[in-house]
From Swiss-Prot:
Lineage: Bacteria, Bacillati, Cyanobacteriota, Cyanophyceae, Synechococcales
Gene assigned in the entry: groEL1
Designated name of the protein: Chaperonin GroEL 1
Function (record text): Together with its co-chaperonin GroES, plays an essential role in assisting protein folding. The GroEL-GroES system forms a nano-cage that allows encapsulation of the non-native substrate proteins and provides a physical environment optimized to promote and accelerate protein folding.
GO terms for MF: ATP binding; ATP-dependent protein folding chaperone; isomerase activity; unfolded protein binding
Binding site for ATP: T29, I30, G31, P32, D86, G87, T88, T89, T90, G413, D492
Organism from which the protein derives: Prochlorococcus marinus (strain MIT 9215)
Quaternary organization: Forms a cylinder of 14 subunits composed of two heptameric rings stacked back-to-back. Interacts with the co-chaperonin GroES.
GO aspect biological process, one term: protein refolding
Keywords: ATP-binding, Chaperone, Cytoplasm, Isomerase, Nucleotide-binding
Pfam families on file: Cpn60_TCP1
SUPFAM superfamilies linked: GroEL apical domain-like, GroEL equatorial domain-like, GroEL-intermediate domain like
Coarse class of the protein's main subcellular location: cytoplasm
Record's keyword annotation contains ATP-binding: yes
Regions of compositional bias (Gly residues) in chain numbering: 531-543
GO cellular component, one term: cytoplasm
Length: 581
């Protein structure tokens, strides 16, 4: 494909247009008086969102060079979302201001490399100050942070606070849609562990990049699976039952993984696989815990058990399993509650019997995972559009609250950034010209979140900042008053601000030091089928279907192994393997 090239100031200006295009759409979503963004969908009703990352992902610009700028700032939002779970709009606003100020100075003759160095020096100073201002989160502050992060919705803040209180900060809290009008909190059996799907091709929700299995059967084994020969009998039973299927094994690789992906994507099996957590003996112990939670039998080599002898009765089950790229959450049925309780009591006895502090800690971690359960926040609303909106709000609020527990909080509303901005003045005065300019870019950017919060609430941002400095108080955009934001419970998670700053400086500095931009030249739209007349029947010849190996017809033994030319196992119709005809 032919490429379009853009150089020097021309390329940077085009990239800036893309940055502004996205940032101007995103920044209306910050603060308690934030506005919403409505997004058209080809199928179904439109989405109404107030999440910066979601808005940024939807934007495509016709100019290919400007679109690169749009994608760069979208990367800021998505990276901050991935790392902190919140703060995407703040990161976007910071990036836009840094890019705008940086390009002004480059046009005036400043060195992009020196600006970058100055920005990095300024960032290090800001992060050090931010850490020193951070305070630990406890008690009622948890509800305050959750409420602020939910746009001032006290109901959401209360529900998240209750969930945190019940399952603790290490517990599992899931958000799902409800059939009722009310948003409710439900505590159920379950656990999570730090392992994600073996392949992204198992994802069932492309937008959220997660795999969800409803009422699945679960195979749990401490063996490594590289070929599916031994699993053919149980896969046949699963296919007949129509149940979703999860394989939890020491590892699943090679031909076995390829075959599962093939059958998943062809609709033959609703399947996913996950590697077992931990290592060595602790891995086996963790698998035993999961087996008890799900009512499964652990297929172990130590017990001389082989995969080819597995029956449907050896499998576990769950209400729901949610798998991300690095985490798996199991929501169990209540019928294993007594077994889980007995397992927890056994583990407590093991803690009393060991003198090793390390072993005690590890066993206590297992107890916490088994006994903690899963908190389900069931989101209710009158319409599907409202439900999606509330669900996003709750997820952002939950992530922000977890971040606040991790690294503490600072007074919100941008007040802390304004205070640090003033501190940067002394640093910039002792630096060389271009280095000082880079530091000043950070200084100016730190004021921008407060300006936008004020603007969204109908106030003049410059006036608000001047009053904050004069009164030495924060601005409550909800009430329009200047007050002690810590006492008012308007708090921002330190982790969210830290990551927003780091991500914004990273992308802004890269963009400012860009000299050449290369993008594909869009190809013209192909002519409509059937030629100029638009005859819908034109060009329909050649409806052969080569390359469809692996989709054997029912009863034809379609589950043949690679290279067997369609010679499948008897009765295994429809489940194709690589290399089949």
């Amino acid at each position: 494909m032919a490429k379009q090239l853009s150089f020097s100031n021309e390329s940077r200006e085009a990239l800036e247009k893309g940055v502004n295009f996205v940032a101007n759409a995103v920044k209306v979503t910050i603060g308690p008086k934030a506005k919403n963004v409505v997004i058209d969908r080809k199928f179904g009703s439109p989405d109404i969102v107030s999440d910066g990352s979601t808005v940024a992902k939807e934007i495509e610009i016709e100019n290919p060079i400007s679109n690169l700028g749009a994608k760069l700032i979208e990367q800021v939002a998505s990276k901050t979302k991935e790392s902190a779970g919140d703060g995407t709009t703040t990161a976007t606003i910071l990036t836009q201001k840094m890019v705008q100020e940086g390009l002004k100075n480059i046009a005036s003759g400043a060195s992009p490399i020196e600006l970058k160095k100055g920005m990095e020096v300024g960032l290090d100073f800001v992060l050090e100050k931010l850490s020193s201002k951070s305070i630990s989160l406890s008690g009622s502050d948890i509800q305050k942070v959750a409420t602020v992060s939910a746009g001032g919705d006290e109901e959401i803040g209360s529900i998240i606070s209750k969930a945190m209180d019940i399952v603790t900060s290490d517990g599992v809290i899931n958000v799902e849609e409800s059939q009722s009008l009310d948003t409710e909190l439900d505590i159920t059996e379950g656990m999570s562990f730090d392992r994600g799907y073996s392949s992204p091709y198992f994802v069932t929700d492309q937008e959220r990049q997660i795999c969800e299995l409803e009422n699945p059967k679960i195979l749990i084994t401490d063996q490594k699976i590289s070929t599916l020969v031994d699993l053919v009998p149980i896969l046949e039973e699963i296919q007949k039952s129509g149940s979703p299927f999860l394989i939890l094994a020491e590892d699943i690789e090679g031909e076995a993984l390829t075959t599962l992906v093939l059958n998943k994507n062809s609709g033959v099996l609703n399947v996913a696989s996950v590697r077992a957590p931990l290592f060595g003996e602790r891995r086996k112990a963790a698998l035993e815990d999961i087996a008890i939670l799900t009512g499964a039998k652990l297929i172990s080599e130590d017990k001389s058990m082989t995969l080819d002898k597995v029956s449907i009765n050896d499998l576990g089950k769950a209400k729901k399993i949610t798998i991300t790229k690095d985490k798996t959450t199991i929501i169990a049925f209540e019928d294993t509650k007594d077994l889980v309780k007995a397992r927890v009591e056994k583990l407590k006895r093991e803690v009393d019997m060991t003198d090793s502090e390390y072993d005690q800690d590890k066993i206590n971690e297992r107890i916490a995972k088994l006994a903690g359960g899963v908190a389900l926040i069931k989101v209710g609303a009158a319409t599907e559009t409202e439900m999606k909106y509330k669900k996003l709000r709750i997820e952002d609020s939950l992530n922000a609250t977890k971040a606040a527990i991790e690294e503490g909080v600072v007074p919100g509303g941008g007040q802390t950034l304004i205070e640090i901005s003033d501190d940067l003045l002394n640093l910039s005065q002792t630096s060389s010209d271009d280095l000082r300019t880079g530091i000043n870019i950070i200084k100016e950017a730190l004021l921008e979140p407060t300006k936008q919060i004020a603007k969204n609430a109908g106030f003049n941002g410059d006036v608000v900042i001047a009053e904050i400095k004069r009164l030495n108080k924060g601005f409550n955009a909800n009430s329009g008053k200047y007050e002690d934001l810590k006492n008012s419970g308007i708090l921002d998670p330190t982790k969210v601000i830290r990551l927003a700053l780091q991500d914004s400086v990273s992308i802004a500095a890269m963009l400012l030091t860009t000299e050449v931009a290369i993008a594909d030249i869009p190809e013209p739209e192909p002519a409509a089928p059937g030629g100029p007349s638009g005859d819908p029947m034109g060009g329909m010849g050649g409806m052969g279907m080569p390359g469809m190996g692996g989709m054997g017809m029912p009863g034809m033994g379609g589950m043949g192994m690679p290279g067997m030319g369609g010679m499948g196992m008897p009765g295994m119709g429809g489940m194709g393997m690589p290399g089949m005809m």
